[in-house]
């Protein structure tokens, strides 16, 4: 990241020691280290996001090529890219109503099972008491 050699680093340390003093220098070094790590983290995050966006853009371009050329004339790589893009589009376009309906069905079936279990326990307790 920075092209700083050993002697430049020693010079910066000595100047910092003279300017800040021995009490404040460790705190200043920690602050600078936090700033540098935050900057590296932000740079890596931006790099990863750009790589992801470029991949999506490449898949979209491959899909456009496929539509123009026709699906029969595609290379295996392009066919795989088209399938990946279609799967990604399907996963994004799923309606939320289906998911909520599945959740309601699961919760109602589990509550029915709970009521049946409680009824069985009650009838078993009544049978034992008689």
Curated annotation (Swiss-Prot):
<comment type="function">
    <text>Part of the twin-arginine translocation (Tat) system that transports large folded proteins containing a characteristic twin-arginine motif in their signal peptide across membranes. Together with TatC, TatB is part of a receptor directly interacting with Tat signal peptides. TatB may form an oligomeric binding site that transiently accommodates folded Tat precursor proteins before their translocation.</text>
</comment>
<dbReference type="InterPro" id="IPR018448">
    <property type="entry name" value="TatB"/>
</dbReference>
<feature type="transmembrane region" description="Helical">
    <location>
        <begin position="1"/>
        <end position="21"/>
    </location>
</feature>
<dbReference type="GO" id="GO:0033281">
    <property type="term" value="C:TAT protein transport complex"/>
</dbReference>
<comment type="subunit">
    <text>The Tat system comprises two distinct complexes: a TatABC complex, containing multiple copies of TatA, TatB and TatC subunits, and a separate TatA complex, containing only TatA subunits. Substrates initially bind to the TatABC complex, which probably triggers association of the separate TatA complex to form the active translocon.</text>
</comment>
<keyword id="KW-0812">Transmembrane</keyword>
<keyword id="KW-0811">Translocation</keyword>
<dbReference type="GO" id="GO:0008320">
    <property type="term" value="F:protein transmembrane transporter activity"/>
</dbReference>
<keyword id="KW-1003">Cell membrane</keyword>
<dbReference type="InterPro" id="IPR003369">
    <property type="entry name" value="TatA/B/E"/>
</dbReference>
<keyword id="KW-1133">Transmembrane helix</keyword>
<feature type="compositionally biased region" description="Polar residues">
    <location>
        <begin position="112"/>
        <end position="130"/>
    </location>
</feature>
<keyword id="KW-0813">Transport</keyword>
<protein>
    <recommendedName>
        <fullName>Sec-independent protein translocase protein TatB</fullName>
    </recommendedName>
</protein>
<keyword id="KW-0472">Membrane</keyword>
<keyword id="KW-0653">Protein transport</keyword>
<keyword id="KW-0997">Cell inner membrane</keyword>
<comment type="similarity">
    <text>Belongs to the TatB family.</text>
</comment>
<dbReference type="GO" id="GO:0043953">
    <property type="term" value="P:protein transport by the Tat complex"/>
</dbReference>
<feature type="region of interest" description="Disordered">
    <location>
        <begin position="85"/>
        <end position="130"/>
    </location>
</feature>
<dbReference type="Pfam" id="PF02416">
    <property type="entry name" value="TatA_B_E"/>
</dbReference>
């Amino acid at each position: 990241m920075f092209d700083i050699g050993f002697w430049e680093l020693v010079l910066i340390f000595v100047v910092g020691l003279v300017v800040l003093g021995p009490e404040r220098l460790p705190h200043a070094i920690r602050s600078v280290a936090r700033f540098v790590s935050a900057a590296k983290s932000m740079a890596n995050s931006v790099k990863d996001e750009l790589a992801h966006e470029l991949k999506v853009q490449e898949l979209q371009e491959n899909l456009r090529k496929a539509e123009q050329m026709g699906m029969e004339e595609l290379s295996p790589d392009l066919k795989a890219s088209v399938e990946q893009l279609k799967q990604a589009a399907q996963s994004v376009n799923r309606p939320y109503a289906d998911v909520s309906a599945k959740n309601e069905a699961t919760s109602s079936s589990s509550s029915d099972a709970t009521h049946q279990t409680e009824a069985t326990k009650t009838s078993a307790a009544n049978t034992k008491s008689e």
